[in-house]
Amino acid sequence: MNLQHHFLIAMPALQDPIFRRSVVYICEHNTNGAMGIIVNKPLENLKIEGILEKLKITPEPRDESIRLDKPVMLGGPLAEDRGFILHTPPSNFASSIRISDNTVMTTSRDVLETLGTDKQPSDVLVALGYASWEKGQLEQEILDNAWLTAPADLNILFKTPIADRWRDAAKLIGVDILTMPGVAGHA
């Protein structure tokens, strides 16, 4: 089972404050473990424009049709001071990893310098921090009914309103997450 370019959808019984009702986009999954970014937990009072200001990045030439008032996500509980930018191609930045044909993760400053300009990737999600699982840990959490999994959908990742991502990600696999009981069993 390789869950790279999949969503983890928190089951209703998962009450951890960071992961409760979360959707995690899995960026890497292999025999050593998994790494992902929570894509539906906006940080309070932090927008992309605020990140650019803190880093003293001024988009030039500024394309006013590109909104920089989008929220920055809490990507996970690890390295909350590090930025992770999920975006559509191109992937010609200094530190980019291609996750799928249509999704790239970049951690270098050069992608931030394109935000708000005509060089910006068409779809962008900025997060601080990430989530990771050790070898076998994620698989066990799935067996323990902590998560549903679904192939990632770019509309949900980049365009769906943040408040709807948890419900809409579950709908990808035919589940109405809002009507699920808080406790699941095994058949």
Curated annotation (Swiss-Prot):
Gene Ontology CC terms, in alphabetical order: cytosol
Family annotation (InterPro entries): AlgH-like
Pfam families named in the record: DUF179
Lineage of producing organism: Bacteria, Pseudomonadati, Pseudomonadota, Gammaproteobacteria, Enterobacterales
Family: Belongs to the UPF0301 (AlgH) family.
Protein name from the UniProt record: UPF0301 protein YqgE
PANTHER family, A to Z: UNCHARACTERIZED PROTEIN YQGE, UPF0301 PROTEIN YQGE
Species of origin: Escherichia coli O127:H6 (strain E2348/69 / EPEC)
